[in-house]
């Protein structure tokens, strides 16, 4: 039951192309790939902590340099009781719905890097202690 209230490593690499008069060479350089980062917010209109986050911390975060460098998606249900219904989930995000689990609370965030969930957090405390720091680290 949802209530109001799996880290994967990222393999990083990039290709550096060096152009000289004699030849073109490619070299793989570990650690230089920046993942495509998506932040998925899941909440409900009748959830007080969700409204609080939307009105304060989301507004502050939306003006940050990190926010400008990620893709932000929202799942906002009119009611907590209907949060998991198909009409609240765009088709391309439904695969993440199963990751919420029966004990999940909202507000909830999934940090997704290159289509892999690498951080899950619930509630304002985990937003500040886990989710936001993970986003900042990924986007450095």
Predicted regions and their residues:
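Bacterial N-terminal signal peptides
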Residues: 5-19
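Extracellular/periplasmic catalytic domains that process cell-envelope and extracellular macromolecules
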Residues: 33, 66-67, 101-105
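Short active-site neighborhood of thiol/selenol oxidoreductases, capturing the structured segment around
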Residues: 34-45
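The canonical Cys-X-X-Cys-His
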Residues: 47-51, 109
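Typically the conserved alpha-helix immediately C-terminal to a functionally engaged Cys/Sec
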Residues: 50-66
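Thiol-based oxidoreductase modules, predominantly thioredoxin-like and allied folds used
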Residues: 66-91
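Short, internal strand/loop/helix patches
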Residues: 85-105
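Non-catalytic, surface beta->alpha helical segment in thiol-disulfide oxidoreductase systems
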Residues: 103-140
């Amino acid at each position: 039951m949802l209530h109001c209230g799996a880290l994967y490593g990222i393999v990083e690499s990039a290709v550096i192309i060096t152009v000289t008069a004699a030849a073109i060479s490619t070299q793989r350089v570990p650690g230089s790939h920046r993942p495509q980062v998506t932040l998925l917010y899941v909440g409900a209109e009748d959830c007080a902590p969700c409204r609080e986050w939307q009105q304060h911390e989301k507004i502050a975060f939306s003006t940050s340099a990190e926010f400008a460098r990620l893709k932000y998606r929202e799942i906002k249900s009119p009611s907590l009781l209907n949060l998991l219904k198909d009409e609240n989930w765009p088709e391309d995000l439904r695969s993440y719905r199963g990751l919420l689990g029966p004990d999940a609370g909202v507000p909830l965030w999934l940090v997704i890097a290159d289509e892999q969930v690498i951080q899950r957090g619930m509630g304002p405390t985990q937003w500040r202690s886990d989710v936001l720091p993970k986003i900042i680290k990924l986007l450095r």
